[in-house]
């Protein structure tokens, strides 16, 4: 009989505890589209640098 109040209190505490479903975003949670855009931009920069060394007329002047 003494355990019943303790059991009820524990149940109330567990029910009022915050949920662990919410997770913070980490730096690894980058959207895939953003990753592809970064890769495309980096490859374009490298291509432009290489092209400018071989043929200066194909350089993009922004």
Swiss-Prot record:
Contains 2 disulfide bonds that can be either 'C1-C3, C2-C4' or 'C1-C4, C2-C3', since these disulfide connectivities have been observed for conotoxins with cysteine framework V (for examples, see AC P0DQQ7 and AC P81755). The modification 4-carboxyglutamate is found at residue 60. It is found in: Secreted. This is Conotoxin mr5.4a. InterPro entries: T-conotoxin. GO terms for cellular component: extracellular region. It comes from Conus marmoreus. Its main location: secreted. Expressed by the venom duct. Residues 20-48 form a propeptide. It holds the Pfam family Chi-conotoxin.
């Amino acid at each position: 009989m003494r355990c019943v109040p303790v059991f009820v209190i524990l149940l109330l505490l567990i029910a009022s505890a915050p949920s662990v479903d919410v997770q913070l975003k980490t730096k690894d949670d980058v959207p895939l589209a953003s990753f592809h855009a970064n890769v495309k931009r980096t490859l374009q920069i490298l291509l432009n640098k290489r092209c400018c060394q071989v043929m200066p007329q194909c350089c993009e002047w922004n």
